[in-house]
């Protein structure tokens, strides 16, 4: 799991890129006088030419070469969509009058009856002022070309038109998929169909249909009817509906790959057939999320007889050459608890459960081969004894993908493409299948990487919200898998994505239309605008953090603001751009000044407008603190702008007062994050620049001076770089912290020192600690804050070292000092010192309320640093504000 700090760093990098690098590695675009194109994914080769092909009721399609019903239906859809978007009635069919403006479609061959992985998807497109010509070797290429034509539609003062253009296009990867989980929350037919339409518009070509899980079995099975009768709550697809979806997908150039997850994630199978399980029943449908113990018994022949019959029936239903067996997250607890299974492992000389699962997979591979299918599964299925036509789907990352390719196996990447993590489109866009270890593969090995899949797992979605969690961000994944590896410009991607987002409405996707309806649900008869003002600048908390904040089950209502909020805020991204331009316009700072002030005033005043509605709505009461926080942030932003415009440095006391606003709770009950916060942080830190701002991502620590240099280094921790104390120190003559590293060029009086700290000592050590050293004079004269796992007279204190053993100067009793360093996580800290009053305050996690306080004027100034008494640990995201001592 990627750490929060890494995500924060990446988000800031995205925001920097959006403003400072808008034209770096972008898709090439039009010259002056010609329209900007918004194609997504961007074609392999494209050139704009003078001229425009006007759209009117005479626009018509003619065929040359191969024709088939699938192409005729595609043309009907094309005409229908074009007519909807322009309001111009267009005639269906392909019979044309010579006076009509033609779209000539040249299809060379019929293609395969069942679309294959390596089927030719290329096409060429030539649009001139008199006609358009689309050529493709197969119907699939024609389908892609028609989608490109629809994206070329523009409007000017004379009406609708398509710009004159030459396009030669083909995908970089042949496998470009979207996984839809219909088990954890049921998804009706109409959800699947409209998302297939969205997939077609972005040239995604594989629907990975996750059809069985602990929480549900979703396909009618004639051979074993208790699978769907007892394992689905009545929510399953009939065979006829499955065939309808497969045909619907084929009409759009999309393969359908079913996934029936085995041997784990199989609780729903066992409700009707407990004899398949490794532990005795009875079983019931699982309502909780997570990794569960039930799994199939891989030692019993009856299990394979059952699966042989099952696979045979499903192989007849699903025509694709691949059959996904899942194979992930088998914890093996029920295997270890079964004496017969343990005896089987011993008899077969199996070292562990991985060997046992490999045996199971080999047996399943034989069954699949018998029924004409090739195996695909998650990382866990990989074993050197498997046939080379097996495809491994990697959720672990490029390293795992590269290893698979080196061993001669084909693979697809999903790590980094999990849409249910509600990360920005730019995050997914920068996940490159041929990066990391995969970049070092030979050309032959690289061909084994077939592509990737975006994943939409269904723990926290419903039919009402699924579209908003897939679109438009899935288009960023689609472009990464289709377009040239050199097309990487984030700013240009967002420019095109915003237009593409609007066009998705024509496909009846609900990602935009359901948003105002869900907000209206919260406010009843009241105006929705104040709530929308707030909702537009928040996003759901990232990754799967929701499950660590409250208990969710399959029956939990998904009717809170976190469910309505969009995964990515357009308003926040636009606001960040405006702030960046404002700050770059030095020294006058006139750019966007009035617009920024207007937006900040609206957010500041919004809470008063919304307050009465929040108090009256049960569904909104939890977000009162969120609304208050936004108002306070906006006020701080306005104050920061005033300091910046007047060219005045903000007082240190003001900075101390607003900094808590920049540290929202890490796991808020409302499960939302305020995404205008980074832009307002920029304003605040410009109003009073920190003396030091260090995240160690450059791999350097040149500003730091350790007392024992060999004990300190910059290293990776949880996927991010930080400053690590790797060896504990030894006590000297004076009892005091033994290891520290100081900011060497800063001698300050008043100070604010913030960052994150992580102790690496075992959790059962009651004296585990990290310290903040300040007003350091020499090794036996300084203050320190001791953050510890326990509280007593000398632990979890503010201490003074004045030429002798340290003494406690903090006012809190041992019972009242609130020791919190009790886990292996990073924790926020803040230490402040007021040189005029001698007041010292130490904060831990909660930046509003200090856990330790003291008053002392022994040392009025000195250096600042981090360290420990006798532990190891890590520090990150260090910032220092202060007054330089004269």
Can you annotate each of these PLM segments?
Residues 112-322, 338, 363, 367, ...:
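Feature activates predominantly on carbohydrate-active enzymes
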Residues 713-739:
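Short carbohydrate-recognition loop motifs
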Residues 731-802:
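Secretory/extracellular carbohydrate-interaction modules
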Residues 851-877:
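Flexible glycan-contacting loops in extracellular carbohydrate-active proteins
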Residues 39-42, 46-49, 57, 125, ...:
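Substrate-binding groove of N-acetylhexosamine-processing glycoside hydrolases
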Residues 25-173, 484, 488-490, 498-503, ...:
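Contiguous, structured surface segment used for ligand recognition
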Residues 803-828:
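Short, aromatic/His-centered strand-loop micro-motif at the edge of beta-sheets
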Residues 207-209, 242-249, 696, 753-755, ...:
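Short tryptophan-centered beta-strand motifs in secreted/extracellular beta-sheet-rich domains
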């Amino acid at each position: 799991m990627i750490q929060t700090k890494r995500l924060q760093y990446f988000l800031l990098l995205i925001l920097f890129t959006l403003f400072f690098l808008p034209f770096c590695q972008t898709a090439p675009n039009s010259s002056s006088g010609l329209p900007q194109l918004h194609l997504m994914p961007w074609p392999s080769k494209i050139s704009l030419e003078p001229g425009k092909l006007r759209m009117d009721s005479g626009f018509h399609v003619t065929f040359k070469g191969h024709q088939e019903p699938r192409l005729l239906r595609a043309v009907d859809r094309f005409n229908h969509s074009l007519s909807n978007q322009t309001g111009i009635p267009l005639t269906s069919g392909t019979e044309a009058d010579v006076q009509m403006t033609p779209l000539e479609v040249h299809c060379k061959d019929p293609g395969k009856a069942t679309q294959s992985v390596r089927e030719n998807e290329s096409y060429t497109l030539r649009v001139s002022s008199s006609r358009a010509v689309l050529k493709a070797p197969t119907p699939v290429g024609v389908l892609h070309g028609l989608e490109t034509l629809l994206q070329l539609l523009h409007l000017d003062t004379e009406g609708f038109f398509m710009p004159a253009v030459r396009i030669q296009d083909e995908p970089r990867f042949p496998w470009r998929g979207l996984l839809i989980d219909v088990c954890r929350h049921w998804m009706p037919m109409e959800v699947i169909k409209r998302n297939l339409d969205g997939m077609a518009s972005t040239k995604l070509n594989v629907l990975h249909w996750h059809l069985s899980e602990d929480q549900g079995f979703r396909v009618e099975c004639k051979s074993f009817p208790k699978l769907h009768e007892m394992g689905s709550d009545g929510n399953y697809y009939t065979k006829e509906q499955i065939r309808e979806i497969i045909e619907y997908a084929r009409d759009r150039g999309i393969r359908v790959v079913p996934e029936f997850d085995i041997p784990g994630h199989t609780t729903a199978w066992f409700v009707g057939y407990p004899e398949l399980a490794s532990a005795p029943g009875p079983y019931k449908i699982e309502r909780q999320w997570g990794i569960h113990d039930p799994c199939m018994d891989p030692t019993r022949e009856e299990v394979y007889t059952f699966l042989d019959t099952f696979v045979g029936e499903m192989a007849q239903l699903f025509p694709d050459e691949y059959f996904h067996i899942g194979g992930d997250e088998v914890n093996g607890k029920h295997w270890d608890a079964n004496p017969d299974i343990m005896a089987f492992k011993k008899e077969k000389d199996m070292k562990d459960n991985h060997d046992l699962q490999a045996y199971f997979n080999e047996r399943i591979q034989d069954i699949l081969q018998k029924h004409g299918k090739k195996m695909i599964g998650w990382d866990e299925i990989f074993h050197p004894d498997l046939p080379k036509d097996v495809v491994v789907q990697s959720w672990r990352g490029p390293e795992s993908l590269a290893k698979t390719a080196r061993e001669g196996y084909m693979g697809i990447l999903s790590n980094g493409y999990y849409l249910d993590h509600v990360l920005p489109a730019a995050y997914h866009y920068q996940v490159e299948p041929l990066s990391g270890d995969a970049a070092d593969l030979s050309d032959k090995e690289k061909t084994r990487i077939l592509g990737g899949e975006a994943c939409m797992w269904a723990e926290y979605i419903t039919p009402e919200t699924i579209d908003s969690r897939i679109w438009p961000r899935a288009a960023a994944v689609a472009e990464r898998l289709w377009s040239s590896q050199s097309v990487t410009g984030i700013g240009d991607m967002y420019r095109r994505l915003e237009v593409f987002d609007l066009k998705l409405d024509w496909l009846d996707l609900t990602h935009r239309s359901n948003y105002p309806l869900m907000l209206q649900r919260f406010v009843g008869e009241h105006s929705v605008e104040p709530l929308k003002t707030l909702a537009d600048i928040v996003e759901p908390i990232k990754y799967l953090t929701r499950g660590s904040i409250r208990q969710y089950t399959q029956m939990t209502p998904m009717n809170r603001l976190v469910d309505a909020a969009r995964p990515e805020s357009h308003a926040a991204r636009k606001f960040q751009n405006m702030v960046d331009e404002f700050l770059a316009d030095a020294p006058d700072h006139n750019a966007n000044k009035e617009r920024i002030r207007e937006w900040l005033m609206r957010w500041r005043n919004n809470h008063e407008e919304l307050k009465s509605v929040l108090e009256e709505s049960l569904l909104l009461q939890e977000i009162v603190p969120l609304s208050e926080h936004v108002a306070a942030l906006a006020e701080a932003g306005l104050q920061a702008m005033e300091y910046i415009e007047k060219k005045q440095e903000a007082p240190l006391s003001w900075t101390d007062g607003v900094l808590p606003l920049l540290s929202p709770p890490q796991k808020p009950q409302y499960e939302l994050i305020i995404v205008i916060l980074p832009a307002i942080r920029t304003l605040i830190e410009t109003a009073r620049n920190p003396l030091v701002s260090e995240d160690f991502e450059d791999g350097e620590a040149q500003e730091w001076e350790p007392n024992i240099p060999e004990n300190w280094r910059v290293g990776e921790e949880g996927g991010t770089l930080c400053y690590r104390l790797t060896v504990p120190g030894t006590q000297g003559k004076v009892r005091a912290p033994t290891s520290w590293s100081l900011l060497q060029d800063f001698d300050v009086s008043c100070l604010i020192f913030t960052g994150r700290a992580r102790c690496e000592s075992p959790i059962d050590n009651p004296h585990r600690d990290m310290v903040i050293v300040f007003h350091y004079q020499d090794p036996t004269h300084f203050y320190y804050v001791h953050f510890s796992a326990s509280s007593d007279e000398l632990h979890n204190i503010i201490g003074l070292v004045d030429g002798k053993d340290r003494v406690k100067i903090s006012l809190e009793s041992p019972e009242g000092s609130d020791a919190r360093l009790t886990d292996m996580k990073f924790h926020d800290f803040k230490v402040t010192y007021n040189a005029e009053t001698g007041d010292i305050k130490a904060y831990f996690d909660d930046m509003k309320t200090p856990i330790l306080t003291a008053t002392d004027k022994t040392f009025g100034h000195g250096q600042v640093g981090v360290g420990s008494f006798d532990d190891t640990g890590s520090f990150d995201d260090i910032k220092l504000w202060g007054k330089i001592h004269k």
